[in-house]
Design a protein with these regions (language model features):
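S-adenosyl-L-methionine-dependent methyltransferase catalytic core, i.e., the SAM/SAH-binding region
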Residues: 1-148
Length: 148
């Protein structure tokens, strides 16, 4: 990408020593039409933070651990703040709450093959919430319950 190429080019001249320097290099690398709303380095810094902190691995492990810990009737509620987290949460919830594709074709599904969980909710912020808290715009609340 042009961001990576520019970072490499600038580092050949001198080391990048501050986040402000890096932000400026990223800004220079992004076409003008993508610079209008928010600082163009925002998503790059988010991606770096996610990778350095292994956030998606920790997120996935945490959800799976929580699902293992709850008893019948217990619920796991997850608030996500960006699409990578939300997609991962949605996929995990789907995997544990649906009958296997092959088993769906059977006339009777054995009891031990029925899902242990049921998805209860997928909630986005209301218009009212967004009026006084615009930062909630990307938040999603997903809820799943152990049924067996």
């Amino acid at each position: 990408s042009s961001i990576v190429k520019n970072i490499i080019k600038k580092r050949e001249i001198k080391p990048i020593e501050t986040t402000l320097e890096l932000a400026e290099i990223i800004k220079e690398s992004v076409p003008e039409k993508y610079r209008r709303d928010k600082h163009p380095a925002r998503k790059t810094f988010q991606a770096i933070r996610i990778e350095v902190n292994h956030e998606l691995d920790v997120f996935e492990t945490s959800i799976k651990d929580a699902l293992d810990l709850i008893k019948v009737g217990g619920r796991v509620c997850v608030i996500t703040f960006h699409s990578l987290e939300d997609r991962m949460c949605k996929q995990i919830f789907k995997e544990v709450s649906e009958v296997d594709k092959l088993l769906r074709k059977l006339p009777i599904i054995p009891e031990d093959k029925m899902p242990k969980f049921k998805v209860i909710a997928n909630i986005s912020p209301s218009l009212e919430e967004l009026e006084f808290n615009n930062r909630a715009r990307s938040a999603r609340l997903r809820v799943i319950e152990r049924v067996r």
